[in-house]
Amino acid sequence: MFIDPVALRIGPISIHWYGILFAVAAVAGAWLATREARRRGEDSEQVWSMLLVAAVGGIIGSRLYHVIHQWDLIYRDNPALILQVWNGGLGIPGGVAGGMVALFAYTRVNRLNFLRWIDIGAPAMLLAQAIGRVGNFVNQELYGPPTDLPWGIPIDQAHRVPPYTNLDQYPVQTTFFHPLFAYEALLNLLGVAVLLWVGRRFARRLYDGDVAMLYFVWYGLVRTLLETFRTGNWVVGGIPVAILIGVGAAVIGAAVIVIRHARGMGTPGAYLREMEERRAAQAQATPPAAPEPAEPEPQAG
């Protein structure tokens, strides 16, 4: 069963499932980030401004990654297709990089703690990625090798990559593929739970930025695992680029956590301490309640 990528047509306007899911993912991620910001004592209203800025940077970065990936196959001869984002084709590694650059610029301009805010955004990012992966099902992207498992999915001829373009050997009606996008979505949801748990369980021991580094470790390992099964990989030097990025992200994320803690390059539980200091300051600034007047003693008579 194949789904029409266009969810709704209104005259000349086509609304694609990919765009709808992108919007749902962004709102869901912002909702979670808002809750995390409040829990950490930050201004939750900043989340929506950051969402717009990070979304622009993320779309540019993810599209650029995809275009470079598919340049020889698609865009060299059809450069006009580069701007047709609604047809799919967004690379998450590029999106993360673009969003991080945009968010760094926003926090610098507004004098906010960049590391603390990417901690707030890390679980939200995984949630958004999990939801966005459903779009890969609609667009028939991010699938693995053929499988006989009951949850295998069909892929039509137009979206096949070699050697699965040979329909005599891999008929459309009887060949089903691993839904790698679904595996990633489930692992991302598990990652959301892990990051939220770590952020709460070890709050007094974590430095600002630790949760974000854990995001890179988690997602890097997930992508490395799944890319070993993916078809149509972008390969450099015989190694899929996504695996290089995944391994690099996981190693760097883990190294940053270990080195910072070994050298004491941070303040454990910084946001908790600041919240406690603010509460203490507010308590001192609040004048004590005036004592109630004593009731007159009854006269003897």
Features from the language model and the residues they span:
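A feature for loop-to-transmembrane-helix boundaries and adjacent hydrophobic helices
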Residues: 1-301
